[in-house]
Amino acid sequence: MLNDASNKENANSDVAADAAARPEQTVLLGLDYGVKKMGMALGNTVTQDARPFDILAMNNGQPADWDNLLGIIDTWRIGRVVVGLPLNMDGSSSMIAKRAHKFARRLAHRLMEQRIHVPVQLFDERLTSVEAREMAWELGLIKNERDPIDDISACLLLQSYLANPDHAEDIATYKAD
């Protein structure tokens, strides 16, 4: 009997040690910023994968429905938001990159107002739209040049982020009181 209790104790401590050794999972939301629409993708830091999620309507660079975006972040228990930063090929900031930066700051502010504790980061997304369109054609996901690929672009953004998270720029992290 003592042996059984000892074995259970060892098994429980092994399970606890295994759980402590595993990296903590964070669900990521990637946003391919746009003036008319914004692609969304979900990613996972443990499995290191990302998948297209949805395309959000934008009104001149701002979400047509902020509550919807904030609700997605809250409902999916997003641990980090990664906003694509569309830099010029030489690395300089484009007009749309400046708008993406402004959007990321507004998003961080809105999250703080709602007391949703999620860091927001910017990540270079040069050529993701070109790559997404090529991939979508090859896989037969689109049939027309005008078919939306924003969610696929967001997915590629997250895959790049997962491979190089140190290259992201922090916008804001909400600190609980």
UniProtKB/Swiss-Prot annotation:
Biological process annotations from GO: rRNA 5'-end processing
A family per Pfam:
RuvX
A GO molecular function held by the record: nuclease activity
Q: Report the InterPro entries cross-referenced here.
A: RNaseH-like_sf, YqgF, YqgF/RNaseH-like_dom, YqgF/RNaseH-like_dom_sf
Disulfide pairs here are: none
Can you supply one Gene Ontology CC term for this chain's record? cytosol
**Which Gene3D superfamilies does UniProt cross-reference here?**
YqgF/RNase H-like domain
Q: What is its EC number?
A: 3.1.-.-
- SMART domains reported for this sequence: YqgFc (SM00732)
Quote the function comment for this protein: Could be a nuclease involved in processing of the 5'-end of pre-16S rRNA.
The protein here is known as: Putative pre-16S rRNA nuclease
Q: Which organism is it from?
A: Psychrobacter sp. (strain PRwf-1)
